[in-house]
């Protein structure tokens, strides 16, 4: 099994391996195999379209965690210029699971805040697998208040399995830090756009997710608990994760239907990791459109709209 492909993508992996094999044969022998390769590439595209046309909620959940999926700093590099990272909560420490700083979107100054998971083992440990501690959320809050003072819009990138549940985090006030962020963001006098780029796990995601407009990538998820966690509670077995994912309605498409999500950002065929530059372009277009809408509003109207949005969560449809 190719580790770069999920279990339901293995037919695609096998076909792409054949295409690569033909390319190598053609290069070594000097024989043109372009017609055969072209036919296989067309077959591969149709196969990929067929598989991705009707993904289950559990398969979308797997895609949202794909190890090659672009993370926040990948998008920062592709979308923004003059990024200057800011560190520390001015209280305890700097949490590398939350990255933040000032940057420019085209010529517009913005404040960026988001989760960062890490690629290799060393970085994953340093980033705590994208699970922030209280100091991470307090750093995020400090940067949001700075953005308000300097009249910069806040752009957040959500990608976390959840807030870190360790004893040390609880001792330093994890729940208080999350709750305080919710309160601050609800009244922050600057536009806020949140984009879920991977998995949006529970309060750990919501702590930087209170916003004027919420965007989700096509194969991202947003939920109160992971499918495995839900299955372990309800069925006493994580093997029921597929059923849990379907029941919870965690996908961007389902949340858009419920009115929770404002914009669903289409991903390249096969997911964001198959064409990160194209994905970045789609996100940039969506961010630009959101900021144009929000910055045309009076601030008091924007805050009233944000409050109404918060109060509508969980209301009967």
From Swiss-Prot:
GO biological process: fatty acid biosynthetic process; malonyl-CoA biosynthetic process
GO terms, molecular function: acetyl-CoA carboxylase activity; ATP binding; carboxyl- or carbamoyltransferase activity
Any single GO CC term annotated in Swiss-Prot or TrEMBL for this entry: acetyl-CoA carboxylase complex
Keywords, ordered alphabetically: ATP-binding, Cytoplasm, Fatty acid biosynthesis, Fatty acid metabolism, Lipid biosynthesis, Lipid metabolism, Nucleotide-binding, Transferase
Boundaries of every CoA carboxyltransferase C-terminal domain copy: 39-293
Compartment(s) of residence: Cytoplasm
The enzyme's E.C. designation: 2.1.3.15
UniProt catalytic activity: N(6)-carboxybiotinyl-L-lysyl-[protein] + acetyl-CoA = N(6)-biotinyl-L-lysyl-[protein] + malonyl-CoA
Pathway field: Lipid metabolism; malonyl-CoA biosynthesis; malonyl-CoA from acetyl-CoA: step 1/1
HAMAP family xref list: AcetylCoA_CT_alpha
Family statement: Belongs to the AccA family.
Quaternary structure annotation from Swiss-Prot or TrEMBL: Acetyl-CoA carboxylase is a heterohexamer composed of biotin carboxyl carrier protein (AccB), biotin carboxylase (AccC) and two subunits each of ACCase subunit alpha (AccA) and ACCase subunit beta (AccD).
Function: Component of the acetyl coenzyme A carboxylase (ACC) complex. First, biotin carboxylase catalyzes the carboxylation of biotin on its carrier protein (BCCP) and then the CO(2) group is transferred by the carboxyltransferase to acetyl-CoA to form malonyl-CoA.
Protein name per Swiss-Prot or TrEMBL: Acetyl-coenzyme A carboxylase carboxyl transferase subunit alpha
């Amino acid at each position: 099994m190719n580790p770069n492909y999920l279990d339901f993508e293995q037919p695609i992996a096998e076909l792409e391996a054949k295409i690569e094999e033909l390319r190598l044969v053609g290069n070594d022998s000097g024989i043109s195999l372009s017609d055969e390769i072209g036919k296989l590439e067309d077959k591969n595209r149709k196969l990929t379209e067929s598989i991705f046309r009707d993904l289950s909620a559990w398969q979308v959940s797997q895609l949202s965690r794909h190890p090659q999926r672009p993370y926040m700093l990948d998008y920062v590099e592709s979308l923004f210029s003059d990024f200057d990272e800011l560190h520390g909560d001015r209280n305890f420490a700097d949490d590398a699971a939350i990255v933040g700083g000032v940057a420019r979107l085209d010529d517009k100054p913005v404040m960026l805040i988001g989760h960062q998971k890490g690629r290799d083992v060393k970085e994953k440990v340093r980033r705590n697998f994208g699970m922030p501690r209280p100091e991470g959320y307090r750093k995020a809050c400090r940067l949001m208040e700075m953005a308000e003072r300097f009249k910069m819009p806040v752009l957040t990138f959500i990608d976390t399995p959840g807030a870190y549940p360790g004893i040390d985090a609880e001792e330093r006030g994890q729940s208080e830090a999350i709750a305080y962020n919710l309160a601050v963001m609800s009244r922050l006098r600057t536009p806020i756009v949140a984009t879920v780029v991977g998995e949006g796990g529970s309060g750990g995601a919501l702590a930087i997710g209170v916003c004027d407009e919420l965007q989700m990538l096509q194969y991202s998820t947003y939920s109160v608990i992971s499918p495995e966690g839900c299955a372990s509670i309800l069925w006493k077995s994580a093997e029921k994760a597929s059923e849990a994912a379907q029941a919870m309605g965690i996908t961007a498409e389902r949340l858009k239907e419920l009115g929770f999500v404002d914009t669903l950002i289409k991903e390249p065929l096969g997911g964001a990791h198959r064409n990160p530059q194209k994905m970045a372009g789609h996100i940039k277009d969506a961010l630009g459109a959101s900021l144009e809408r929000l910055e045309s509003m009076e601030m008091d109207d924007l805050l009233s709209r944000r409050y109404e949005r918060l109060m509508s969560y969980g209301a009967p449809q």
